[in-house]
Amino acid sequence: MITRNDVEYVANLARLTLTEEEIEKMTKELGAIIEFANKLSDLDTEGIEPTAHVLNLYNVFRSDEVKPSYPREEILKNAPSHDDVCIKVPKIVE
């Protein structure tokens, strides 16, 4: 059972500020989610292999293929700022 304190604790961890209505709503919704997840414990999983993925696919790669690119002029035409060779972007790191 999820309590109001549980919701407030998780909200604090996530640095969220919730209203009273949101706390009540989240308490009910998270309680319903936990209740549903607990129903999975009642399932008969005898003979079913535990898995980490739904499909048995691991490290599926595509082959590298050389394909034609857009002309540089076309790409730069759509850029808000460029120097005829590269797209200019605002500096974000000092």
From Swiss-Prot:
Job description of the protein: Allows the formation of correctly charged Asn-tRNA(Asn) or Gln-tRNA(Gln) through the transamidation of misacylated Asp-tRNA(Asn) or Glu-tRNA(Gln) in organisms which lack either or both of asparaginyl-tRNA or glutaminyl-tRNA synthetases. The reaction takes place in the presence of glutamine and ATP through an activated phospho-Asp-tRNA(Asn) or phospho-Glu-tRNA(Gln).
Catalysed conversion reaction: L-glutamyl-tRNA(Gln) + L-glutamine + ATP + H2O = L-glutaminyl-tRNA(Gln) + L-glutamate + ADP + phosphate + H(+); L-aspartyl-tRNA(Asn) + L-glutamine + ATP + H2O = L-asparaginyl-tRNA(Asn) + L-glutamate + ADP + phosphate + 2 H(+)
EC number(s) on file: 6.3.5.-
Alphabetic keyword roster: ATP-binding, Ligase, Nucleotide-binding, Protein biosynthesis
Record keyword Cell membrane present: no
Matching Gene3D superfamilies: Glu-tRNAGln amidotransferase C subunit, N-terminal domain
Family: Belongs to the GatC family.
InterPro entries xref list: Asp/Glu-ADT_sf_sub_c, GatC
Protein name: Aspartyl/glutamyl-tRNA(Asn/Gln) amidotransferase subunit C
One Gene Ontology term from the biological process aspect of the record: regulation of translational fidelity
A Pfam family this chain is assigned to: GatC
Keyword Protein biosynthesis on entry: yes
SUPFAM superfamilies: Glu-tRNAGln amidotransferase C subunit (SSF141000)
Example GO molecular function: glutaminyl-tRNA synthase (glutamine-hydrolyzing) activity
Enzyme class: ligase
Complex and partners: Heterotrimer of A, B and C subunits.
